[in-house]
Swiss-Prot record:
Localisation: Cell inner membrane
GO terms assigned for molecular function: ABC-type transporter activity; ATP binding; ATP hydrolysis activity; ATPase-coupled lipid transmembrane transporter activity
Mode of membrane association: Multi-pass membrane protein
Protein name: Heterocyst differentiation ATP-binding protein HepA
PROSITE patterns, per the entry: ABC_TM1F (PS50929), ABC_TRANSPORTER_1 (PS00211), ABC_TRANSPORTER_2 (PS50893)
Similarity field: Belongs to the ABC transporter superfamily.
GO biological processes: heterocyst development
Keywords tagged on the record: ATP-binding, Cell inner membrane, Cell membrane, Heterocyst, Membrane, Nucleotide-binding, Transmembrane, Transmembrane helix
Transmembrane stretches, start-end: 33-53, 77-97, 163-182, 186-208, 290-310
Gene name per UniProt: hepA
Amino acid sequence: MPKSPHKLFKANSFWKENNLILREIKHFRKIAILAVIFSFLAASFEGVSIGFLLSFLQKLTSPNDPIQTGISWVDMILAADAWPIPPIYRISLLILLSTWMRATFNYFGGVYTESAQLNLADRLHKQIFEQLQALRLSYFAQTRSGELINTITTEIERIKQGFSGLAFVLTRIMTVCVYFVVMFSISWQLSIISVLIFLLLAVGLSTLNKRVRETSFGISHANAQFTAVAVEFINGIRTIQAFGTQEFERQRFYKASTNQLNAAIKVVLAWTLVKPIAEGIATTVLISLIVISFATFTLPVASLLTFFFVLVRVIPNIQDINGTVAFLSTLQGSSENIKNILQTNNKPYLKNGKLHFQGLKRSIDLVSVDFGYTADNLVLNNITLTIERGKTTALVGASGAGKTTLADLIPRFYDPTEGQILVDGLDVQYFEINSLRRKMAVVSQDTFIFNTSIRDNIAYGTSGASEAEIREVARLANALQFIEEMPEGFDTKLGDRGVRLSGGQRQRIAIARALLRDPEILILDEATSALDSVSERLIQESIEKLSVGRTVIAIAHRLSTIAKADKVVVMEQGRIVEQGNYQELLEQRGKLWKYHQMQHESGQTNS
């Protein structure tokens, strides 16, 4: 059964190469249609103006002879008895009119084309944002942030240029079509020969365009690597300077930059080869047609001159089309990167539930939970644990024991590989994620501070917080004093990642942020580890006040921070090895007692 026109179009290589752009046009089709209409009108008036220009030149050189351009409709319009004013003036008027009409339509065509490509970039930005918002954290753990930034910025900008290129090709094709109409009206035989030769040229250049397309993937990969290295350099500048690794980073940065340069040169060498080859072949076509026409066809001199005048105007447009198609081929790597991010069949998504979480009534139960960041490497093994409402559950263990990973399962940053997490007897996956997380607050050892004011950082995620509430939580978090000492107090901008704050100050801002949310469930991941002993004591007191009536999951290396917990869970290598009351576990002289002894000897307990 023959394919439908729609399926044939989608099977076409042009669609396959540019479908990212073409499929998005439907979302701003009105703008795109207006751009096409105005571009077509501009192309039409360009063809019309050629006929008038030829007539104008003919009247200047032979004012008494009848107009013979070889274009019958032009000759008819400009016939001597058709107008009450002299021919030279009427032609001048028509040239000016067609020129200004073409300029007007070109202006509107350009405006709508630019508007369409801006809409395209806006849609792609938002689609990628929504895609990244919906993905599990495991995706980000396996993907370099620099590569994502490169896709959101550089690659989308290149695709935006691609839309402009497509619009340019479409405009030039319409212009060439108008020229061919003029040429066919003069000599259909010469026109058919011209079309066949140009088609052969297009087929030949398609081989070069394939080469350009292949090199485009190299430049996209090099751009992604360069951006990743640059982002790591900027984010890690403190560590780089502290370890004196400037020379190592210089070599790494220079290598990434050189790779980007070499990849770009390969693209340029392949791309720029297309236009001169097209120009050489087109000139050969022109000379060959002149020879053929004089040897074979008997056309009036005026018609022949008009035909070749139009053909001379066609050739640069053909060259521009071929050059732009080659440029579009350089964007295939960018297009593939964007499509790879937007693909849904190979991404880890969180399954969102439909039940609105009203709050914890009884307990959170982990039942035979296994979890691994990869399928063949489990981080948690057979975890069975009950976290009771309104009580503090402390997770203790050496680094890498799985404490943070276990806590990350509660707000569904990850889902178990096996087993279930039950909230009041219901699988946590039944609940709508945001309603669940709005009842929680997380203070982690990796505190993120936004490049905005202290006030906005504390109030982040809590709408409608009053000034008094913000000051109060800052006081409870032992942050009010240093905030008031800042140049602009609560209005002080903190810089990227809170670069103007010490580690302890950043931690206290994060604790104040959590206090303001007034959460039912509080997750403290080494929340006081970055504080000095005085601040730690003050924060510990405020956390104890905050914990009253709330469910707290506290993670700490220091035993002093979990001594008053209702339940202590000791973990080793992803397994629970002990759980119970702090004092009871010490009396058993098991794993917790060994941790206690080790830290007591190093002076880290308060006993």
